Amino acid sequence: MSKYHEIKELRVLLLKKEKDILICKTLKTPLLSNIEINKIIQVKVNKPSINKAFDCNDFWENTILYLLDIQMDKDDFFYPKIIVLEPDYLLDVSAIAECFQDYGTSEYNYLLSKLIPVNNNKHILLGNFANMVVDEIFSNPIETDFDNTFLKHFQSIPFEYTTCKDIDDKNDFLKFQADCKGHYVRIKSLINNNFKLLGINIDKVVLEPTFISEKYGIQGRLDILDFEEKEQGISKIIELKSGTPPFPDDGFSIKPSHQVQLFLYYLLISQANKLNIQEWEDKIHGYILYSKTIKNNLRHKTPSLEIIQEILNTRNKIIINEHIFLQDNIQKTEKLIFQINSENIIKKQIHNKFNDILATKINSLLETFIKSSEIEKKYFITYLNYVSYEHYLNKIGICNSSNEKSSGLASIWLNNLKEKQEKFEIIYDLIIHENKIDTKEQTIIFKKTNLKNQYSNFREGDICILYPKNENYENITGNQLFKCTIKSIQKDFVEVYFRYKQRNQLFFKSFGRKKKWALERDFLDSSFNTLYKNLFQFLQAKKITRNLILTIEKPRQNTNYQYNNLELSPEQNRIINKALSAKDYFILNGPPGTGKTSIIIKNLVKELKNSQKNILILAYTNRAVDELCDAINSSFGNSEHINFIRFGTELSTADNHRKNLLKNIIGNFSEQKMSRNLIRKIVDEQHIFVGTIASIGNNEHI
């Protein structure tokens, strides 16, 4: 092909496929004002040395594509080197990376991870601990030591430690603690000694920065980033891994999944810094930090265009599978489920013993599905399709190709400032009033400078994205983003809490005192991830449980409880008695204000609290949970004692119930007494547990 013209990128709508040609219509492309919109173009695919790595056979009409690094010939055919399917559907970098394993690459790994629950184990705890070590060393470089860091980690996730069967035995726990100390020593030494040798500016490092790309359809949170503007130097990425490198370890190789994760971070940083792939070698240095190995912990690698094409083609295949769920077709979804098997996932020769173990794990999903009855399969598939559609709306919202208005996460880059203003979906023109991000408070107080911000659709506890404002708010995804939570919101000020404490305020100060910032609401995948796994757990449940959920069997009754409270009406007594007499479940439905919480729940708790049975009380929203907490306290005569354990965070819990959070309960004990036995004792002494469905669902060990 003789090159005639080059175009950096295009956002297009796929109209029709004709063999190796995609007939597309150009759409408005962010930051590119010179693009002719609604122009019909022909895109050539499956071309050797250009884009043959991309399999476009299963692309569907009226889908969005993002084309990058495009060449045009004299006949006006477009030859993109990168083709991204449904770029507004952001996939986590780590989820894509899991498709690349030592035993082969397969998009079905994504579905496997999506559906099969992962039990709490020591490897997860160790990885979590290693990340805390980094946080502690950067935020408290002088005062940090292993004992305090290990204790702090235990206090931050006491339930996880107490319910982890891998370390239940004392000797196993001591071995785990020793492993943690080894990781601590190596991480601290690398940060204090090796980082300077790599040219990493410790004072400029940012922890856990978030980036999203509406071009590549990915989002990711890096562990450590030393960001340099394109003209000023080299950006350094450090991704921490507490697991093992490839076996056998040659001292420089990186596991496929870790390598892919690192390469996708290259994409995110290159977009933020406006780099082309030819500049990566000189402008980005990425490292995997293996904290388990004794030597050669830091391993560097730079991706090639061919590898990036392979990675993004796998991302496209994941999206194709997700689109099958959206069609709500039982036969198509069932056919896809049958593709999740060891033959499609294990593609390389591995040791027979390991192959057998791995195949058993992989095939467990399909085998469970096959053993299920027809009605159970249909229930599973129907809800899988339904949840997938809701998840899609959460990410992209309801939009069409003509105006592309979105109400999901994609609204951040698809909707303009005026549209966000009309829906009160943005707080903008904020300036920093007080910065405490480098203190234990981990907060910033912003002052509102625009009168249009008097009204907004935000409240305390909302999870948001914070980003530095440019002149027209159009380049949001070209910035580093901070995930935060609104701690308080007032007429003139808004205070936000950050998950990660930073070493200093240098990043924020680099923009100047008058720099303006914006807040928009974030959308989380975690609740949906729990729903997918719960669906598979339904197939694994006992037969009686499945039959009750499917209403094949009627809920059973115990003997008449004979409840009677002279202070209640006959109808209220009847309802409570039926609930107490139920063996399996009891459904109470009624409009707001009819006393479901203030009377029925309150008196049910009052009756059951002396039975020594554990009671789990759930609601959808934190506000509803707080109302339930009020009702529980009322059933105890508003005693000041700890009457229940509340699951959640400080910011999501009403002030008067924060003392019931487990971390605050154990905070009343001295550090010398802190132990798993203490946690068990606290939990055993309490019989009432309260939280949102999401908070309980995300913590299955509870």
Residue ranges and their predicted role:
Residues 106-109, 289-323, 455-577, 633, ...:
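Pre-ATPase regulatory/linker segments immediately N-terminal to the P-loop/RecA-like helicase/translocase core
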Residues 605, 611-702:
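Conserved P-loop NTPase motor core of helicases/translocases
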Residues 571, 582-588, 612-613, 687:
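Pre-Walker A (Motif I) flank of P-loop NTPase domains
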Residues 27-60, 202-316:
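Mg2+/Mn2+-dependent nuclease catalytic core
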Residues 2-232:
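Metal-dependent nuclease catalytic cores that hydrolyze phosphodiester bonds in DNA/RNA
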Residues 1-25, 127, 131, 306-458:
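A helicase ATPase "motif cassette" and its flanking acidic/Ser/Thr-rich regulatory loops
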Residues 582-606:
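Walker A/P-loop
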Residues 21-23, 30-54, 391-544:
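Conserved ASCE P-loop ATPase motor domains encompassing nucleic-acid-directed helicases/translocases
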